[in-house]
Amino acid sequence: MSWFSGLLVPKVDERKTAWGERNGQKRPRRGTRTSGFCTPRYMSCLRDAQPPSPTPAAPPRCPWQDEAFIRRGGPGKGTELGLRAVALGFEDTEAMSAVGAAGGGPDVTPGSRRSCWRRLAQVFQSKQFRSAKLERLYQRYFFQMNQSSLTLLMAVLVLLTAVLLAFHAAPARPQPAYVALLACAATLFVALMVVCNRHSFRQDSMWVVSYVVLGILAAVQVGGALAANPRSPSVGLWCPVFFVYITYTLLPIRMRAAVFSGLGLSTLHLILAWQLNRGDAFLWKQLGANMLLFLCTNVIGICTHYPAEVSQRQAFQETRGYIQARLHLPDENRQQERLLLSVLPQHVAMEMKEDINTKKEDMMFHKIYIQKHDNVSILFADIEGFTSLASQCTAQELVMTLNELFARFDKLAAENHCLRIKILGDCYYCVSGLPEARADHAHCCVEMGVDMIEAISLVREVTGVNVNMRVGIHSGRVHCGVLGLRKWQFDVWSNDVTLANHMEAARAGRIHITRATLQYLNGDYEVEPGRGGERNAYLKEQHIETFLILGASQKRKEEKAMLAKLQRTRANSMEGLMPRWVPDRAFSRTKDSKAFRQMGIDDSSKDNRGAQDALNPEDEVDEFLGRAIDARSIDQLRKDHVRRFLLTFQREDLEKKYSRKVDPRFGAYVACALLVFCFICFIQLLVFPHSTVMLGIYASIFVLLLITVLTCAVYSCGSLFPKALRRLSRSIVRSRAHSTVVGIFSVLLVFTSAIANMFTCNHTPIRTCAARMLNVTPADITACHLQQLNYSLGLDAPLCEGTAPTCSFPEYFVGNMLLSLLASSVFLHISSIGKLAMIFVLGLIYLVLLLLGPPSTIFDNYDLLLGVHGLASSNDTFDGLDCPAAGRVALKYMTPVILLVFALALYLHAQQVESTARLDFLWKLQATGEKEEMEELQAYNRRLLHNILPKDVAAHFLARERRNDELYYQSCECVAVMFASIANFSEFYVELEANNEGVECLRLLNEIIADFDEIISEERFRQLEKIKTIGSTYMAASGLNASTYDQAGRSHITALADYAMRLMEQMKHINEHSFNNFQMKIGLNMGPVVAGVIGARKPQYDIWGNTVNVSSRMDSTGVPDRIQVTTDLYQVLAAKRYQLECRGVVKVKGKGEMTTYFLNGGPPS
């Protein structure tokens, strides 16, 4: 609403276009008089009295309405009705990286180095929705899963402390401090597991538990480093690697916290290794290898955490989007149906919808939706002096004026039990007695006429302009319904309707009735002779006796006074409860459905509906989603739909749908595997001696992985590569089976690189060499014997016979093998059971090689040399007899247990990822199914609506942002208008029992109009818009919006001319096959018009202006079987080489004499 001169004026939704600025621009008012017809004073006088209220403040935009929420385009922008994508957007996602780069300033260009660094930095940032409320919803959404995951992690950590305690206590006397630390850690883990399983456990507590766990892990790591015996920078590397990995994958913390924690644990171990092993000769080599090992573990953690969280957030926002659509679609469908029923009576609309829905087979004739009603009264009312009124208004004010006046008439019609049929320019006609019969139909029409005259008298007093109403009423029989296939409008036909139309020829301010109507009034009104035949030739020819209403009889006045008193009493009792009359826009929302009940929502949601209607749409969706999250049971969903161990869906169709899911990040997974391979290569090149075989194996594996990465990357940038390569890439990425095979192949290559170098090392047992030198049995050799022979840890030269180099630090073989297993966790699309099988096979191969193969001697030699290293560090000297026992479990016996712990963690993470993905898929699928059903209904309703209103007009009336009192109006600079009438149809139409009282005549008219509608639907006539039919007259126009207006080529004008000629040809074809002799008269004109919608409760699209009037005159003054055009149109068509001839000067009502032309044909082909 806007304030002008202190009075309330309805806001007009101006649709000014490039071709309509001049016509849409307001002209200055004449004089300074404020009582003009188009002034705000007149507008307020037509409204119900109410105190002025301030303009409501615009509601605050929630974060979803920024870049993230794509608002529905308004009319005039070429937008279609329908769902819009909802990109919920969190601050640091892949989807927002481009936005973030673009928003960084003009110096940040896509593809630049700075942009690439910015995108890389976003990977390390915590993901968070812009809306704090939405972020809380997301955390609640995954809370149950995170709670379950955290509980299982506590169990794994209890197992880990038991393993560490066994490794520490088994070989020698344990250190009490370290044992106490592990016991405390285990006790805390058990306590935390109990806490996590409590129903009172909350989201905030989860963060606390996570950070407590990190603190315990750091303490255990420090204790393990201090308790190690013997000490070495490479001893116990697997433990911090495990801690770093579970920090990223099994602890429910944000990315930034995970990165800091992972790097913190890694740095802590490096510092401890440096401080505790300062005298080690090979300290820096091992610290460098340790740093690479930890850095690779952090990279794997990031490559696992980032896509998993992004996928979860995208699944959440997609689910929310589907729920939002599911909640909003019923509203939109209800709005569409309400709009449909505001244009067509319910009985007609429902019958048409049922026929469309059942998709009946083609019939020889189109079905006609006509009903016959006897004993009705028809009122035609015309505004006298409207032309002079319109000349004082701008285009905007004209639509505003008509809307306010006819909206008042619509309200009066509803109060007087009349059904408005149509608005034709300034003519308003309605019927009482349909669709439900009424005995007092004549009284209702007379009272309607009295109210209309009172309303226009008020306008006359306020404006000072001589306007009045001419009202004519006749009672009889009508056929009502719709004709044609497009732009349906409810209408009535019959001889009685024709007669009622001519009854308009009355004195201004009087109600003109026929004797048939008078008979139904039962003497309740005083009348006088109307002498209608003196003013209308049709009435004279038909010998119609007419009367003028003088006033109500005394009895009728008393009845009306009593009714008015009852209405006032009722209105006073409802005062303050009922709002002022405005077009209906509020619709109740239906949220419960079968699928939603499956998701945890039942009919109890209806109890909160009243509160929900007060929420804005975004808050309503969040409120509903919050209830759904609280109500759903993860365990129940798993039990009902997912197999327990395999995590496959119980239903085959669901499993097939899930298997068709495409993971677009698969190329990134393979790239991460390549990165892990590079780290393994660097570690082994740094720690172990080089060999030609080793370098050859690494080069081959690198080439294979690089080819795999490039092949998968083609999927994302396919246009740059050959078609065959693109096809191969698509076949890998889009197929879950193919991508799984490629993923397993990549992990096998990385695993091969981790173990291949073991076969190039020296496999001679040191015990055998030393025993031979000392002349003792190999079983008697101890670390003290090796110390006496000056054997030490870290020498690359062969210690015994042979030329193969010595691999002194097999801990890194174990570490590299663990990295290769961790690389499998990056491939999120591989099923948990598939990963478990792969880990089992790879672990079994490694253990067989370790325990039974030649590489086992490398680990035996390492254990002995590590003992020598410990003796050297202690500076104590022992002989071979009293040499102390080894202070640790042999590495090759520790490795199977380490593998078991890692395999358990990897499997739990795989289960968590797959379970989350499948439950998200299931929830989204349930919401999608209902959404698709609603979309089908929406598209179905939309097709019906577009058969009533143009698309942009329907979009305007269905827009959620539209205000109740907004009008639709559009100024169009150059529009071609056509009126095509069947000149002699009135002679053909007769009402006889043989033709079902005229229904068969209307059936033929329906076929004719349907043919015209089918022609206008052709692609070549896409610039044309059917406006309406008026009896047997067909009205169309072209160039009414930006998509159909051709300013330069004027193709929309020639299209209408071609259409007019097609109608002439079609009429000849109809005459040949129906054995009739219908004659068409067609009139064409061009110029500016005002297009808009009149009627608030029952919107009716129409166009107004001098252009329309002249076009109608071209039809009425035309010649049968000819197309008459104006001079303006002649100039355009002649320039296009159309064939025209001059008719000469024609007298046109209201315009004087005009030179017109006949259109004979199109341009030469």
From Swiss-Prot:
What residue ranges lie in the Cytoplasmic compartment? 1-149, 304-670, 911-1165
> How many cofactor units bind, and how?
Binds 2 magnesium ions per subunit. Is also active with manganese (in vitro).
Any ranges marked Extracellular in the topology annotation, and which? 757-816
Catalytic activity annotated for this protein? ATP = 3',5'-cyclic AMP + diphosphate
- What regulates this protein's activity? Activated by G(s) G alpha protein GNAS. Inhibited by G(i) G alpha protein GNAI1. Is further activated by the complex formed by GNB1 and GNG2. Activated by forskolin. Inhibited by calcium ions, already at micromolar concentrations. Inhibited by adenosine, AMP and their analogs. Phosphorylation by RAF1 results in its activation.
Record's SMART domains? CYCc
Q: Which UniProt keywords apply?
A: ATP-binding, cAMP biosynthesis, Cell membrane, Cell projection, Cilium, Glycoprotein, Lyase, Magnesium, Manganese, Membrane, Metal-binding, Nucleotide-binding, Phosphoprotein, Repeat, Transmembrane, Transmembrane helix
Q: Spell out the post-translational modification annotation for this entry.
A: Phosphorylation by RAF1 increases enzyme activity. Phosphorylation by PKA on Ser-659 inhibits the GNAS-mediated increase in catalytic activity. Phosphorylation by PKC on Ser-553, Ser-659 and Thr-916 inhibits catalytic activity.
Which positions are annotated as binding Mg(2+) 2? 382-383, 426
Its EC number(s) = 4.6.1.1
Which residue positions carry a glycan here? 790, 875
GO BP annotation list: adenylate cyclase-activating G protein-coupled receptor signaling pathway; cAMP biosynthetic process; cellular response to forskolin; cellular response to vasopressin; intracellular signal transduction; negative regulation of urine volume; renal water homeostasis
Residues engaged in binding ATP: 382-387, 424-426, 470, 1028, 1102-1104, 1109-1113, 1149
GO MF annotations in UniProt: adenylate cyclase activity; ATP binding; metal ion binding
In the bilayer, the protein is annotated as: Multi-pass membrane protein
Q: In which tissues is it expressed?
A: Detected in brain and heart.
Q: What is known of its domains?
A: The protein contains two modules with six transmembrane helices each; both are required for catalytic activity. Isolated N-terminal or C-terminal guanylate cyclase domains have no catalytic activity, but when they are brought together, enzyme activity is restored. The active site is at the interface of the two domains. Both contribute substrate-binding residues, but the catalytic metal ions are bound exclusively via the N-terminal guanylate cyclase domain.
Q: Give the protein family.
A: Belongs to the adenylyl cyclase class-4/guanylyl cyclase family.
Q: What is this protein called?
A: Adenylate cyclase type 6
